[in-house]
Amino acid sequence: MGLSSSKDIDLLVNFIENRQGATLALPWPEDYRLTLHSVENIPDISREDVQNWAKTYMCCEGELVVVGVIHKAKTRTCRGPIVLQGARGHIYVYNGFFDRSLYHVASSFHDLFSNGLRFFYPIYETCDYALDSTVALDMIAHSKSFSELLHYRNERKNAFFTLKTYPYKTFVRFCNLSMTGFSSKHLIQWRRKLQTSLLDVVFIVQHNFFGDWRELVVVFDGHGMLFCVDREESLLFIARNMSDFLKIGCLRYNENRRLHTQWFTQDTDYIKQVDEMFSRDVLCPLREHCQRSRRDRGLLKICTSLVRGINCIERG
């Protein structure tokens, strides 16, 4: 049985146990591989860890099975980001070396081996810049401080560069606030939302998303983080720094695949980081079939019925 056709958990476990150490090439990034390993052959994790990840991050999968480890072609190893399959067939990668988050990377093995790890954001750390490296390094060098990036932007107003970021081309133009459709009033509102006094416009971005041209205004704060503002005036996190932006582009704008800790819990003591607060809401991979969404809709109907009943009693 081929790995791409595996849907049953028991069959998948047997498949992996029988093919321990087999290595499969990923389509992106080109020099990355997936080596099959069962949980027992991966140091530093246990079955209990995997069960805890399912409880912490999942609402619908119910169970996660370790498939193997991601690594570079010339560094075959049993240590690295861990690939898992959920009971409903979706593919996830757990990153224990960077942010200890789970990423939903594909809807199936066929999807994974067609598109690679494009939705596993930490992988971009090891990738080349999506434009000329000399230009990229110069831009990164001038983004070390807020004032220096402002000066760099002012010297290059209207200068264009292109980011070839999946799955669309992204055209980026240096600009200031007066070159956008927004005013100083909007800038003040964004500063209040982000609770910072250092925030300004750096780019206008046009990207072709499956035939639909969209325009975003990109702002940066005193810590070097980048956020975008769209036509609905939504303020969304897109990059931790300039280097991150020049590799990932606006990928985070369209969809958030990072399942951070406390995703589905109601822990009131949990303090969200800025990138979590202003990222798009994480969507359950099952979307409209999500059990949690169905439960929430059911509770909403019950509450609505109770309110209507109370109103009828009061009117009576």
UniProtKB/Swiss-Prot annotation:
<protein>
    <recommendedName>
        <fullName>Protein U25</fullName>
    </recommendedName>
</protein>
<dbReference type="InterPro" id="IPR003360">
    <property type="entry name" value="US22-like"/>
</dbReference>
<comment type="similarity">
    <text>Belongs to the herpesviridae US22 family.</text>
</comment>
<dbReference type="Pfam" id="PF02393">
    <property type="entry name" value="US22"/>
</dbReference>
